[in-house]
Amino acid sequence: MNKQLLTLFPTPIITVEIPKELSVACNYLDSIPQKDNGSSATYGTYSENTYVMNAPECKELGDFILKCVGDYGRNILGYDYDEYAFSQTWVSWKQPGQMHHNHTHPNSLISAVFFYGEREENTPAITFTKQFAVANCSYIQPLMVKDRKDIPTAWSSFSINYNPGLLIIFPSYLSH
C-alpha cells in the first residue's frame, strides 16, 4: 500500500537564538518600571511602557528582531511587505506558577516572544493552543487517544520551554 500524509495549512513557528552581544538590552528591560493589574499572584507584572523596543537602549535588539520577522514573513509565510514595525512591545515578568491568559494578537500579522533573564526551576513555558471553535471545524468533538505525543497532527497544544536568549516568532492569530 502506498500512502502519503499531506499536512495542509501548517502553522509555522520559528525559534531564533539572539546573539549574545544583543543581550545588553536586557539590562534596560530589567530597569523599567513594572505595573500590577491587580492579579499579580496569578498573572505576574508587566512594564508600564508598552513600547519598550522604541527605547534607544533596545535599538540593536529591535532591529535584529524586525529582520527576523521580515525573513519569517517573506520566506515562511509568503507575505509581501518591504518592512515591518512594532505595533507594541512590552515586558512581562512571571514567577513559577504565573501565566498569561490564552490570547491572540488581532492587531498584527506576526508576533514574537523573547525570553531573557535567568532560568529558574518551574519557569513557565509558552504554550500555543489549537483553536477548535473556528471555521472548517466539526461541531462533533472526537474522542482522542490519550497519548498523542507521537501524533503531531493530533496535538491540541504545544509548549516551548523558557530558554534565555530565545526569540519565538509566530502568526498573530495563533492562540498562546
Residue positions per predicted region:
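Catalytic core of non-heme Fe(II) oxygenases with the double-stranded beta-helix
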Residues: 92-169
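A short coil-to-beta-strand element that immediately follows conserved catalytic motifs
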Residues: 78-89
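Non-heme Fe(II)/2-oxoglutarate
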Residues: 1-79, 99, 125
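A generic structural micro-feature
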Residues: 8, 83, 104-108
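Residues at beta-strand starts and edge strands
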Residues: 10-12, 87, 108-110
